[in-house]
């Protein structure tokens, strides 16, 4: 059976093509009910096909509880969970203590230089550390896991969290659109492996195509990998795409500040004349992204990679992360014709070693594609002899920003980075062949994050630009920025755990609704 000519076409596109063919008015009247039925119009004012652009923005190193544990209506600090009491640090003595108990504590951003929770450093968050924290699913070993690589005063930082007062723009975005409280990073490890999953749903656990990539290297590899990536699937399907990335600071430390981004790590992008290089390496952010939005040439799928200062990687100010999100949103809002048919998904690559009380779903031993299967596991950098499971990893923040996801809304379905690829599959019919059968059955496709049963609201959200408020915070973070991006290799300024301890609670308002998802 041949594919329907309606497949992948919005109602607007169909009508344009029909009128462009010179169809008479009576034909339009006759065809309208058929067209509406084809799109399942019924009582639904919106449909997945109305979203013509999917824009993916990924930030750095924050867990859900760390950012949104106090947010109303979500699976946060009000949950009944023994995981909130982690053993290994004594807040009264401010010392390592196997019998000591630490609960989540606020990282207060109002205390000024050298005391400021804005500038805390990176907890341990690589493959070994996150598997130790997960502890076979017990989720009870966060502090001892930190103590394997961090000196005493830095161990309890894993339990720190922020409130609305500390990250007001993040909370405002969560109130204005759909927050996902069941969104996980893909892997129990750090940045590069999770970003590879975001781009390709793979880290090559069998070691046949340049992997396995289990940890974050000091430098982004050049043309190391050769497995198929999602842009190639889009290319073959004729679906337009680009990776827009900031070009500043060169190939140094973390993926967000690589001058050529993730695609350059693949051998098939080595030819600068190839479409992988033209669309996956050359486009700049925010310059080319803004130009394409203005000119109505935004591709169907876009990946955004801002500069390091706006990535929210500890010890950079969390306030600068708001600059990144608002900048992307403002660019989209600058062209209402683009904004009204766009979904911007803001997620975080990994939890950054910050605590989350929800134990992630993980694959049973032996699940194909979900464990490292190279013969010599000890030869894999950073493996610590651990074969898996690969994931899911711990929860991270995710906000779905679109006229079709105006909030306050919350969805609790289980998602991970491959869910973004599944959304692309659902909307444009492009396969995700790297995804394992187990993962495909566990995580959703994010269509449930949209409220298609309600008319879209494309009015401009009331968001002031946070740049002026964020810039003064940067100088007070400089000591920890310099020392804290070295994965604990140099001593930085610790944050003292408050004592006595008080378990945090969640806000009571706003009450969040549940989006309709697809409807008919």
Curated annotation (Swiss-Prot):
Its EC number is 3.1.4.3. Optimum pH is 7.5. InterPro entries: Alkaline_phosphatase_core_sf (IPR017850), Phosphoesterase (IPR007312), TAT_signal (IPR006311). One of its GO terms (biological process) is symbiont-mediated disruption of host cellular anatomical structure. Its main location: secreted. It catalyses: a 1,2-diacyl-sn-glycero-3-phosphocholine + H2O = phosphocholine + a 1,2-diacyl-sn-glycerol + H(+); a sphingomyelin + H2O = phosphocholine + an N-acylsphing-4-enine + H(+); 1,2-dihexadecanoyl-sn-glycero-3-phosphocholine + H2O = 1,2-dihexadecanoyl-sn-glycerol + phosphocholine + H(+). It is found in: Secreted, Cell wall. Polymorphism was discovered in the phospholipase plcA/B/C region. Some strains seem to lack both plcA and plcB genes, while others lack only plcB. An IS6110 insertion element has been found in strain LCDC-194, interrupting the plcA gene. This is Phospholipase C A.
